[in-house]
């Protein structure tokens, strides 16, 4: 694949802005597309996102609300929520050139279809090259230029390598992979485990319980991933264990902070605080997919039951602790 000189980022939220900053620091010409008029105005006039205050856009970043303008880039980062990805790609598809890499930067599974992000891209834009970017990374850290490592996966190794090279800068190190499914599974599954870890923290059950929850959550992640064809080394890498470790340890993670609120006794609606916790959408889908493959995922079951109002936090914790003893 030829080198990538221009990158478009669709989505001017915190993560989209951070990735636009990174691409600009890597020497690419960057177009940042924002659908929301208020945030687009803020990005254009103040050179700052409403969702990432205090971070000034790099001079190389051009802000636009014209999707056709963004579609002219050599590669496009799709930094929109998982549940609206299909809508965005469907609008984008007629505007892009053949074999344009479209990189999903959301971690989730589509409701109703059980499709992963790259599968949605392949269906909605069949002439594009689907890819996924995932790993332990908070927008604020990336935007500030703090050291971060992620994984970029595509079916074609040359495409994955070219994308990693295009996004590589002094503080942002992308590893490349061809295990697309493994990278996607890790990102989606850890969201649910982060909610569980947050519940433990919010309930003040202690560091020992949090370590146990995170470790057993990783066991579920590996079980689920291997059942759906992920490579074991991917599960142990940045997009699996790395992302899980980060998101199960800090309120910077929306899923962890959402779980903390549930652990403190807040309702699901109140705990959301108007912010997206992708794990809340993913949990029931993940559970359906696990059952289809006869994969045992008790932590995921507990999270889904809490979210659906089928059990209380204390009852779910009690059920996990009274499961039959077994070999590790």
Curated annotation (Swiss-Prot):
Alphabetically list the UniProt keywords.
Cytoplasm, Lipid biosynthesis, Lipid metabolism, NAD, NADP, Nucleotide-binding, Oxidoreductase, Phospholipid biosynthesis, Phospholipid metabolism
For this protein, what is any one GO molecular function term? NAD binding
Binding, sn-glycerol 3-phosphate: 107, 135, 137, 190, 243, 253-255
Question: To which pathway does this protein belong?
Answer: Membrane lipid metabolism; glycerophospholipid metabolism
* One record GO biological process: glycerol-3-phosphate catabolic process
**EC number(s) on record?**
1.1.1.94
Catalyses: sn-glycerol 3-phosphate + NAD(+) = dihydroxyacetone phosphate + NADH + H(+); sn-glycerol 3-phosphate + NADP(+) = dihydroxyacetone phosphate + NADPH + H(+)
Q: Which residues bind NADPH?
A: 15, 35, 51, 107, 139, 254, 276, 278
Q: PROSITE patterns annotated for this entry?
A: NAD_G3PDH
Predominant place of localization? cytoplasm
Which residues carry out catalysis? 190 (proton acceptor)
Subcellular location per the Swiss-Prot or TrEMBL entry: Cytoplasm
Query: What are its GO cellular component terms?
Result: cytosol
- What is the purpose of this protein? Catalyzes the reduction of the glycolytic intermediate dihydroxyacetone phosphate (DHAP) to sn-glycerol 3-phosphate (G3P), the key precursor for phospholipid synthesis.
Family, according to the entry, reads as follows: Belongs to the NAD-dependent glycerol-3-phosphate dehydrogenase family.
Annotated protein name in UniProt: Glycerol-3-phosphate dehydrogenase [NAD(P)+]
- Name the gene that codes for it: gpsA
């Amino acid at each position: 694949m030829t080198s990538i000189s221009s990158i478009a980022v669709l989505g001017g939220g915190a993560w989209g802005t951070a990735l636009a900053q990174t691409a600009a620091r890597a020497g690419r010409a960057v177009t940042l597309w924002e659908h929301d008029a208020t945030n687009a105005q803020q990005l254009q006039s103040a050179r700052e996102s409403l969702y990432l205050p205090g971070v000034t856009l790099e001079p190389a970043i051009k802000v636009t609300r014209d999707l056709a303008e963004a579609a002219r880039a050599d590669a496009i980062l799709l930094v929109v929520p998982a549940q609206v990805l299909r809508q965005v790609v469907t609008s984008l598809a007629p505007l892009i050139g053949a074999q344009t890499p479209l990189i999903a930067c959301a971690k989730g599974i589509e409701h109703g279809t059980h499709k992963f992000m790259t599968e949605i891209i392949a269906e909605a834009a069949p002439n594009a090259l689907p890819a996924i970017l995932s790993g332990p990374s908070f927008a604020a850290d990336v935007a500030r230029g703090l050291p971060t490592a992620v994984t970029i996966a595509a079916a074609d190794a040359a495409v994955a390598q070219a994308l990693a090279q295009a996004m590589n800068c002094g503080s942002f190190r992308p590893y490349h992979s061809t295990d697309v499914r493994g990278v996607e599974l890790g990102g989606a599954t850890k969201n649910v485990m982060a909610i569980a870890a947050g519940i433990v923290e919010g309930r003040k059950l202690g560091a020992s319980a949090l370590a146990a929850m995170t470790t057993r959550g990783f066991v579920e992640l590996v079980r689920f991933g291997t059942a759906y064809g992920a490579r074991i080394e991917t599960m142990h890498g940045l997009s699996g264990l790395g992302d899980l470790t980060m998101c199960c340890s800090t309120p910077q993670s929306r899923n962890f902070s959402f779980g903390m609120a549930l652990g403190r006794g807040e309702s699901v609606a109140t705990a959301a605080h108007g912010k997206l916790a992708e794990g809340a959408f993913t949990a029931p889908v993940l559970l359906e997919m696990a059952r289809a493959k006869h994969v045992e995922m008790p932590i995921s079951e507990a999270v889904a039951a809490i979210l659906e109002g089928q059990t209380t936090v204390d009852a779910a914790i009690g059920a996990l602790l009274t499961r039959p003893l077994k070999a590790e």
